[in-house]
Amino acid sequence: MTAPNKIWTADFKGQFRTRDGQYCYPLTVVDGFSRYILGCQGLLSPSLKGTQTVFGRLFGEFGLPQIIRTDNGAPFATCAIRRLSRLSIWWIRLGIYPELIEPSHPEQNGRHERMHRTLKAETTRPPAATCRRQQRRFNRFLDEFNNKGEF
């Protein structure tokens, strides 16, 4: 990773329940060079619509990267030809190359996975009462991680 905003990494942290029983799926997006967390949005599901909305907002705020590196889970990849999903086709149309790590090799996105470990420890133990309150925790974490270097 040779320059800011060239390669972004993205992943869902994995679902968990808030104290009211609602599932939360944190979508995280990181600049691969600077390790700046561009976004962490708690979604109600890992749907195309929600994921595309988050990326659209990030593109508007930070511009378009050249590459987005993800794992092989939905909505990033499918079992179709070349594993292209509707999301990755959208990225291609925007001029972004979707780069998939090898299946079952999360270490190929190791920096991102390490950030996830810290995110989980700092924001979900215990989980917040609601998804809205959980998002506030994610927002505080982003501020501390990006601006205060506390992790």
Question: Where do the language-model regions lie?
Answer:
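Charged helix-capping and loop-helix junction motifs
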Residues: 81-86
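Short, small-residue-enriched loops and turns at beta-alpha junctions
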Residues: 16, 76-77, 108
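Active-site-proximal flexible loops/turns
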Residues: 18, 38, 78-79, 116
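Charged alpha-helix within mobile-element recombinases
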Residues: 87-151
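Mobile genetic element proteins and their domesticated derivatives, centered on retroelements
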Residues: 11, 29, 35, 55, ...
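Mobile-element integrase/transposase regions
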Residues: 1-30, 36, 44, 48-57, ...
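Acidic/histidine-rich, metal-coordinating catalytic segments
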Residues: 58-80, 102-104
